[in-house]
C-alpha cells in the first residue's frame, strides 16, 4: 500500500509498505534515503522505516548491502537492529528497499547542539558506544564512520550505533586501495593514519573516532573541524603536538613523513587547558583514545576497563560477537567487477533469504 507522510514543501515522498504499518512523520533524510516514523498496527509498536533508493549508484548499493547484512548479523543492545525488511512483490518491480527498525527519538549530534551534557551523561554514552564497538571489533568488523549523528538515543538515554554502510572486515587481506575512494566519512572524526597512509587501517581508527566524540560531548563543539585534508591534520597536530621520532617513523608512507617534516614544530596542548571544567578521569581516557600513533592507542577492551567508566563497567555484561564468516564481504572484494544489476540481485537475494 502506498502511503504519504504529512509534509511541508513541494516534494512528494511515498512509502510503498505493508498495510500493517501506518506512516506518520518524516524524521530524517539522507543522500539516498528517507526515514519516517510509523506504527506497527497489530502490536501498536512505534518503528522507524528507512526507505532507500540505491540503484542509481553502485556505491549506494554496496552501502545498502553492507548495512543489511551487518545489522542482521549483530544482535546487541547498543547496535540498531532491523526488525523487518519489506519483501518486494517481484524482482521486476523491485526499486526501493524498506528497512523497519527500532524508533529512536534523537541522535548525539542533535543532543550536543541543544544541551550541555553532564559528566554522568558523557560516561554513560561513551560506555554504551564502546560496548557496541567491543561486539563489532570482536567480530572483526570496523565501523569506519563513527560520529555523533550515528549514535541514536532515546529518552531513557539508551544509545544505539547505526549506519554500517562504510563498515568492512578488519581481517581484510586486500590493501584497502578502494578505501579512500568510497571513504566519504565525515573528515572531523577521521584518524590521522587515514590521511597519512593508504595501507593499513586497524580497529584503532574507530577508537580515534570515539575520542573525538568524547571531546565533543565535553565541550559542546567538534575538536577537529577540518575544512579539508591538510587543515584536518593541522588541527590534530595543533593539539597533539609534533609527533615524536618513534611515531614519525611509524608512518609508513614516505610522502606523508615528508609532509609532516615540512610543518613547523608544535608543542602539545594539555587537554586540561582545552577542557578546564572536565573530570580528570575523562581527560585521561581522552588522552589514551586520541594517541597519534594507532599502535599506542587504547583498545576498546582497555577503554571499557578505564576508571572513568568504572560506574558502568561489567565484564559479564559486555558481550562479544562471533567473527564474521569467511566470504561475508565477498561482494566488497569484487565490487569493481559487479554491475549495478548484479548488485541489485545481491540486495534482492539478501532481502528474500
Swiss-Prot record:
Mitogen-activated protein kinase (MAPK) that plays a role in conidiation and regulation of secondary metabolite biosynthesis. Acts as a repressor of dihydroxynaphthalene (DHN)-melanin production. Disruption phenotype: Leads to a strong increase of dihydroxynaphthalene (DHN)-melanin production. Results in about 3-fold less glucosamine and a lower level of alpha-linked mannose within the cell wall. Does not affect virulence. PANTHER family: MITOGEN-ACTIVATED PROTEIN KINASE. This is Mitogen-activated protein kinase mpkB. Its cofactor is Mg(2+). Its main location: nucleus. Residues 21-309 form the Protein kinase domain. Keywords: ATP-binding, Kinase, Magnesium, Nucleotide-binding, Nucleus, Serine/threonine-protein kinase, Transferase. It comes from Aspergillus fumigatus (strain CBS 144.89 / FGSC A1163 / CEA10). It catalyses: L-seryl-[protein] + ATP = O-phospho-L-seryl-[protein] + ADP + H(+); L-threonyl-[protein] + ATP = O-phospho-L-threonyl-[protein] + ADP + H(+). GO terms for molecular function: ATP binding; MAP kinase activity; protein serine kinase activity. CDD domains: STKc_ERK1_2_like (cd07849). It is found in: Nucleus. InterPro entries: Kinase-like_dom_sf, MAP_kinase, MAP_kinase_CS, Prot_kinase_dom, Protein_kinase_ATP_BS, Ser/Thr_kinase_AS. The active site is at 145 (proton acceptor). One of its GO terms (cellular component) is nucleus. Gene3D superfamilies: Phosphorylase Kinase, domain 1, Transferase(Phosphotransferase) domain 1. The keyword Nucleus applies. The gene is mpkB. Its EC number is 2.7.11.24.
Amino acid at each position: 500500500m502506498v502511503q504519504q507522510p504529512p509534509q511541508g514543501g513541494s516534494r512528494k515522498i511515498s512509502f510503498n509498505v505493508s498495510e500493517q504499518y501506518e506512516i506518520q512523520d518524516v524524521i530524517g533524510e539522507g543522500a539516498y534515503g528517507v526515514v519516517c516514523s510509523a506504527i506497527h498496527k497489530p502490536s501498536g509498536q512505534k518503528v522507524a522505516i528507512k526507505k532507500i533508493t540505491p540503484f542509481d549508484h553502485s556505491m549506494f548499493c554496496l552501502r545498502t548491502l553492507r548495512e543489511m547484512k551487518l545489522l542482521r548479523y549483530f544482535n546487541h543492545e547498543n547496535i540498531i537492529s532491523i526488525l523487518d525488511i519489506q519483501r518486494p512483490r517481484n524482482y521486476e518491480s523491485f526499486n526501493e528497499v524498506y528497512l523497519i527498525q527500532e524508533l529512536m527519538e534523537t541522535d548525539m549530534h542533535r543532543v550536543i547542539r541543544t544541551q550541555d551534557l553532564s559528566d554522568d551523561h558523557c560516561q554513560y554514552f561513551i560506555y554504551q558506544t564502546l560496548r557496541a564497538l567491543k561486539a563489532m571489533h570482536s567480530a572483526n568488523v570496523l565501523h569506519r564512520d563513527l560520529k555523533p549523528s550515528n549514535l541514536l538515543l532515546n529518552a531513557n538515554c539508551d544509545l544505539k550505533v547505526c549506519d554500517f554502510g562504510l563498515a568492512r572486515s578488519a581481517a581484510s587481506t586486500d590493501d584497502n586501495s578502494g578505501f579512500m575512494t568510497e571513504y566519504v566519512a565525515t573528515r572531523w572524526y577521521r584518524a590521522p593514519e587515514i590521511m597519512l597512509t593508504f595501507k593499513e587501517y586497524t580497529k584503532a581508527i574507530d577508537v580515534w573516532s570515539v575520542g573525538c566524540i568524547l571531546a565533543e560531548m565535553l565541550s559542546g563543539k567538534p575538536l577537529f573541524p577540518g575544512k579539508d585534508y591538510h587543515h584536518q591534520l593541522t588541527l590534530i597536530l595543533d593539539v597533539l603536538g609534533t609527533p615524536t621520532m618513534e611515531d614519525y617513523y611509524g608512518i609508513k608512507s614516505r610522502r606523508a613523513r615528508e609532509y609532516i617534516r615540512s610543518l613547523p614544530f608544535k608543542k602539545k596542548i594539555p587537554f586540561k587547558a582545552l577542557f578546564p571544567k572536565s573530570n580528570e578521569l575523562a581527560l585521561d581516557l581522552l588522552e589514551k583514545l586520541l594517541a597519534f600513533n594507532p599502535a599506542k592507542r587504547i583498545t576498546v577492551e582497555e577503554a571499557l576497563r578505564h576508571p572513568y567508566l568504572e560506574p558502568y563497567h561489567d565484564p559479564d555484561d559486555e558481550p562479544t560477537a562471533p567473527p564474521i564468516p569467511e566470504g561475508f564481504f565477498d561482494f566488497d572484494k569484487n565490487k569493481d567487477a559487479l554491475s549495478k544489476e548484479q548488485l541489485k540481485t545481491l540486495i534482492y537475494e539478501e532481502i528474500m533469504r
